[in-house]
From Swiss-Prot:
All copies of domain CoA carboxyltransferase N-terminal, residue ranges: 29-293
Catalytic activity: N(6)-carboxybiotinyl-L-lysyl-[protein] + acetyl-CoA = N(6)-biotinyl-L-lysyl-[protein] + malonyl-CoA
Record-stated family: Belongs to the AccD/PCCB family.
PROSITE patterns according to UniProt: COA_CT_NTER
Positions that bind Zn(2+): 33, 36, 52, 55
Enzyme class: transferase
Protein name: Acetyl-coenzyme A carboxylase carboxyl transferase subunit beta
UniProt record, GO biological process: fatty acid biosynthetic process; malonyl-CoA biosynthetic process
Compartments in which it is found: Cytoplasm
A molecular-function term among this protein's GO annotations: carboxyl- or carbamoyltransferase activity
Length: 293
């Protein structure tokens, strides 16, 4: 059997990725919690920041919902909204990268997988980036990296603290080295932000993996995480096969990482804005007017 035939067999279903599938969440009016099975009215779930009132499970939310939970009302100013990805490599796997981009843009209304801007949190100005897992798994390509880098540089110039909400499967393979170099570019911008003695906090949400974890997600002065978020670099099964040993059941969860010193604090979504405001005040940040972006 040739190598090509070997891969073809696996594409037919002999190899199944170890991905936990989300259960059906209802018909648009109701949502079923994947953790406890509780069926809840969708409007009630949204009013509770998409957190299950029965078990505390944090449902996945998009970038717009995330920004609304963090920023003071009407305070968010979008930056670099006109940046959009291209296909410099002409990449094609099962489908062309250009087709995947068009599909994600149509389904999400976004140009790429992150929204960046300036906002206030209880009157305190800061830079804010919110990654959106709906857009190609929140993967980090050249536009995601450029928008985050520009936000960091703008926050540094304005002497503002910074929060990046991470939700990503890692570097975008369809862009090859162009995506991988974003790790170093963002890290360099964060170092200049640190040299200016400014506060940077990443918020690790479910999931935060791959090249995002290996770069800016772990470079914060304070590393925050949502409860039970999946956080890691390589997949659990890959690690088990490499080490040839069974990993703990809670391995790569926010709680496991906090226990081992990789996460500073776990913040329930319903307490996020007040917690951020307290942390900003503790670091000497004060309410002030935010000039236009």
């Amino acid at each position: 059997m040739s190598l090509f035939d070997w891969f073809a067999d696996r594409r037919k279903g002999q190899y199944v990725a170890n991905v936990k599938q989300e259960p059906d969440e209802g018909d648009g009016l109701w949502s079923k919690c994947p953790e406890c099975g509780q069926v809840v009215y969708l409007k009630d779930l949204k009013l509770n920041a998409s957190v299950c009132a029965n078990c505390g499970h944090h449902h996945r939310i998009d970038s717009a919902e995330r920004i609304a939970l963090i920023a003071d009302p009407d305070s968010f100013q979008v930056l670099n909204a006109d940046l959009a990805p291209v296909d410099p490599l002409g990449f094609k796997d099962r489908r062309a990268y250009a087709d995947r981009l068009r599909e994600s843009q149509a389904s999400t209304g976004l140009r790429d997988g992150v929204v960046t801007g300036l906002c206030r949190v209880e009157g305190i100005p800061m830079g804010l980036a919110a990654m959106d897992f709906r857009f190609m798994g929140g993967s980090m390509g050249s536009v995601v990296g450029e928008k985050i880098t520009r936000l960091i540089e703008d926050s540094t110039a304005r002497k503002l603290p910074l929060l990046i909400v991470c939700a990503s499967g890692g570097a975008r393979m369809q862009e090859g080295m162009l995506s991988l170099m974003q790790m170093a570019k963002i890290s360099g911008a964060l170092e200049r932000h640190r040299e200016a003695e400014l506060l940077y906090m990443p918020l690790l949400t479910h999931p935060t993996t791959g090249g995002v974890t290996a770069s800016f997600a772990m470079l914060g002065d304070l590393i925050l995480a949502e409860p039970k978020a999946l956080i890691g670099f390589a997949g659990r099964r890959v690690i088990e096969q490499t080490l040839r040993e069974k990993l703990p059941d809670n391995f790569q969860t926010a709680e496991y990482l906090q226990e081992h010193g990789f996460v500073d604090t776990i913040v329930p979504r319903t307490q996020l804005r007040s917690t951020l405001a307290n942390l900003l005040r503790l670091h000497g940040c004060k309410p002030m007017e935010l000039t236009s972006a």
